[in-house]
Amino acid sequence: QMRLQLKRKLQRNRTSFTQEQIEALEKEFERTHYPDVFARERLAAKIDLPEARIQVWFSNRRAKWRREEKLRNQRRQASNTPSHIPISSSFSTSVYQPIPQPTTPGSMLGRTDTALTNTYSALPPMPSFTMANNLPMQPPVPSQTSSYSCMLPTSPSVNGRSYDTYTPPHMQTHMNSQPMGTSGTTSTGLISPGVSVPVQVPGSEPDMSQYWPRLQ
């Protein structure tokens, strides 16, 4: 309790200022930061305050002004710092390497064209595919001719039905110049995909009765 009482005695009562007093003090502070004793006494009589309180207010106001001025200087330096940072030559050389410029305007294009030409020349030439090379037109041999003709009976009439021998258009000239086949010539007739039966094509009157049971 004694301690609290002593502390209260040492503490000074805070002075409360009215709006008119603060305005008069601020106006005097704008005129001078260090008013003399005569100015303080005249102001004290004007705003009804002790001269000691006015002196303390000016002291606190100057301290506040110095803090604000310090902050303003720091902000001003921070805003001006990026434009005034010196860049050393070693830093700029190590980070930003100079870009080599071509000696002549067309040198870069010339090098590019040469590289493209070398690339395309290194590719193997594409083989030319023509119908004449891949599909040679050879005259049909008698065995091929007979294989086409054996797909249907060569007899004019079998079991009362007549059949005509199928001849491809491009083989008609060879069919007219070459005989259908000689006696004893044997070829393979294609009945269905993957099935083949030997068929004898005689040159004279054929006997088809022995072949029809196989086909049926």
Swiss-Prot record:
User: Which residue ranges does the record annotate as region Disordered?
Assistant: 68-109
InterPro entries xref list: HD, Homeobox_CS, Homeodomain-like_sf, PAX_fam
Q: Where does this polypeptide localize?
A: Nucleus
Q: What is its main location?
A: nucleus
Under the heading SUPFAM superfamilies, the entry gives: Homeodomain-like
List all Low complexity biased stretches: 81-94
Q: Which residues bind DNA?
A: 10-69
Q: Which Pfam families match?
A: Homeodomain (PF00046)
Q: Per the UniProt record, which residue ranges are transmembrane?
A: none
SMART domains the record matches? HOX (SM00389)
GO MF, one term, reads: DNA binding
Sorted alphabetically, the Gene Ontology cellular component annotations on this record are: nucleus
Q: Which domain of life is it from?
A: Eukaryota
User: Keyword set for this entry?
Assistant: Developmental protein, DNA-binding, Homeobox, Nucleus, Transcription, Transcription regulation
Nucleus in keyword set: yes
Q: How does it assemble?
A: Interacts with MAF.
This chain's function reads: May be a transcription factor with important functions in eye and nasal development.
Q: Which family does it belong to?
A: Belongs to the paired homeobox family.
Report what the protein is called. Paired box protein Pax-6
